[in-house]
Amino acid sequence: MSKSKREVIKLISSAGTKHFYTTTKNKSHNLKKIKLKKFDPVIKKHVIYNEAKLK
């Protein structure tokens, strides 16, 4: 079996609520860390989510 070109990552809320999303990204195309604006259900607002490694 070959290795997947996609890496599983965790998107952590910048609001400090410890809420996170998991997603995948292509290792060869996206070398920079991802920042996305997504909904945080804990504070019920859209905030920036930063990429972190999934342990």
Swiss-Prot record:
GO terms for molecular function: structural constituent of ribosome. InterPro entries: Ribosomal_bL33, Ribosomal_bL33_sf, Ribosomal_zn-bd. It holds the Pfam family Ribosomal_L33. The keyword Ribonucleoprotein applies. One of its GO terms (biological process) is translation. GO terms for cellular component: cytosolic large ribosomal subunit. Keywords: Ribonucleoprotein, Ribosomal protein. PANTHER family: 54S RIBOSOMAL PROTEIN L39, MITOCHONDRIAL (PTHR15238), LARGE RIBOSOMAL SUBUNIT PROTEIN BL33M (PTHR15238:SF1). Belongs to the bacterial ribosomal protein bL33 family. This is Large ribosomal subunit protein bL33. It comes from Wigglesworthia glossinidia brevipalpis. The gene is rpmG.
